[in-house]
Amino acid sequence: MRRVLSTGGAALVIALAARPGVARAQDHCGERAPAAGFLVSAEWLTSHRDDPGLVVLEAERTRAPYDSAHVAGARLIAVEEYTTRHGEILTELPPVEQLRARFESLGIGDTGRIVLYGETLAVTRLFFTLDYLGLGDRVSVLNGGLAAWTAAGGEVGTAPPPPAERKTLTVHPRPEVLADAAWVNAHRKQRGVLLLDARTREEFDGTKAEEGVARPGHIPGAVQLDWTTMLTDGRFREEGELSRLFTAAGATAGKEIVTYCRVGSRASALYFAARLLGYRVRLYDGSMNEWAGKRELPVVRRR
């Protein structure tokens, strides 16, 4: 798995907090939600380390990077704690109560900021999970990850902190940020919907086999936008650059974006970037793992 936004073991940091005075865009419920403020600097994190209720989590697929070095006081959360398998579908959201209980055990309550860093796709998938739970207005990304943190003089540790004080967390699930196969099939031909495929060109074309994808190719009408193009030199691109990439793929202010990939992991990076830019966006969690397994649904393969 590619690690970005990192040197020395940590990739990407998300700080759950909205900054006042930033540009805003409509969210799915018609309320005002932050379109900027998702990206912050190491200096910003340094100046907020003592904020009441601040929780720092490292999101990883294995424990090794955390044990090697982590932001002092950070707690480890594994991808398997916020994803689950449903039958043949490899990566799905666990039950809401399971997620809520786990986050409460990590010291997350209804106030305070949460900082996430770790392997890039582990972090963007966690961003999506928290956004689904209604915490999106508290989310930001510290560009540069642990490398930026240490360069700014931030304290690094190797031992885990004491157990967190359990908090009470109120969640407000947002089904409008999710898409399933039925929704995608019903809306994929609509002019106001843009399907973005986060996989490589070879996977999109169907010339490269993928584990768990019964029929190689892509969903008809989808546009390929490799998730790695969101990044440069270990950081998310500037908003202007991201905007140009999305515009070139067909995104406009009036369209709803649906991201997908193989199992819903790489799609979360496009989901994060779309949220950063203020687009209405859904993530098709089952992605090609589910879609290609439904023989009644069409798949385009370039030969």
Language-model-detected regions and their locations in the chain:
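Bacterial N-terminal signal peptides
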Residues: G8-R19
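Helix-loop module immediately N-terminal to the HCX5R catalytic loop
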Residues: T84-D110, D226-I257
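Flexible, polar/low-complexity N-terminal or interdomain linker segments that lie immediately upstream
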Residues: I14, A23-A64, N143-G212, V299
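Positively charged n-region of N-terminal signal peptides that target proteins for export
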Residues: M1-V4
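Solvent-exposed loop/turn segments at secondary-structure junctions
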Residues: R61-A64, E80-T83, E119-V123, L146-A148, ...
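Thiolate-centered catalytic microenvironments shared by cysteine-dependent enzyme domains
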Residues: D27-P34, L93-A182, H187, G217, ...
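Active-site-surrounding "flap" and adjacent substrate/cofactor-binding loops of secreted or lumenal enzymes
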Residues: A69-Y82
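A mid-sequence, solvent-exposed acidic-amphipathic segment
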Residues: K189, L195-F236, L245
